[in-house]
Amino acid sequence: MPSINPLANALATLYNNEMRRNKQALITPASKLIISVLRVMQKEGYIGEFEYIDDGRAGKIIVQLLGRINKCGPISPRYPLDYNGLLRLPDYIRKYLPSKEIGIIIISTPKGVMSHRDGIREKIGGVTLGYVY
C-alpha cells in the first residue's frame, strides 16, 4: 500500500527508534525531500551520518541516531510563512516547540530546505515541513 505522507512516516520512524534507544533507523521509501530534511537535522546535531541505499524500488535510508531527539514530527498542513512570519513565530508554530531557543522548525524555501533560524538569517520565508527538539 502506498504511503500517503512519506515525510511523516520518516519522522515517525526516527522518533520511534529513538524512543526504543536503537542506534540505527531504517527509513523507507526514500525521497529527495526526506534526504534534505535529514541533512538539516544532521547539521543541527540531532542525527549522525545517514546512507542512501538504492534497492531498485523507492530506496532506503539508514540513519545513525545519537539519542538527541526528544520529539519530532511533521507540520500538517504545510503553513506558508513569509520572513515577517518567521520573525514573530506565529501561534501555530509556537505550539510545536517547547521554547524559542530549543528545537527547530524545518522549512522549505526557494533556496532549499533549512531550519527556521537559517531562514531568519537569510531573510527568506517558506513552507513549514516539520519540527525537531
UniProtKB/Swiss-Prot annotation:
A GO cellular component annotation in the UniProt record: ribosome
GO molecular-function term, one example from the UniProt record: structural constituent of ribosome
Gene Ontology biological process: translation
UniProt xrefs under InterPro entries: Ribosomal_uS8 (IPR000630), Ribosomal_uS8_CS (IPR047863), Ribosomal_uS8_sf (IPR035987)
Claim: Glycoprotein is one of the keywords in the record: no
Keyword annotations: Ribonucleoprotein, Ribosomal protein, RNA-binding, rRNA-binding
Subunit structure: Part of the 30S ribosomal subunit.
Function summary: One of the primary rRNA binding proteins, it binds directly to 16S rRNA central domain where it helps coordinate assembly of the platform of the 30S subunit.
Family membership: Belongs to the universal ribosomal protein uS8 family.
Protein name as catalogued: Small ribosomal subunit protein uS8
